[in-house]
């Protein structure tokens, strides 16, 4: 009778060992897929922040050139090409980007990124400068 019980338990033993092996394989595969996804998202995040930083650098340079030209023209404020609000928002955006660090343990990293995105759009509109986002139609 013992032999018959062992024969019946073969199926359940195979089920249990297969389940454990599947869990181990799933953990391993999940780690690899998670690593790849994190790597891709990290690259996208870095590209986005780099784009914002490069735009802000160029805009700050344009504002400084504009200010130098205005100072050479007898301080005539009517020659301003950029709005005061736009320049103020550019300063705030510059500060946000300087303070932004890619610390993935920080839970507010995405909140700060969305704040940078909003400030970037607002600043580009107020300064009247073209960006790649403005080139695309939005319906």
UniProtKB/Swiss-Prot annotation:
Intrachain disulfide bonds: none
Pfam families found in the cross-reference section: Yae1_N
A GO CC term assigned to this protein in UniProt: nucleus
GO biological process: protein maturation; ribosomal large subunit biogenesis; translational initiation
Homology family: Belongs to the LTO1 family.
Protein name from the UniProt record: Protein LTO1 homolog
Origin species: Dictyostelium discoideum (Social amoeba)
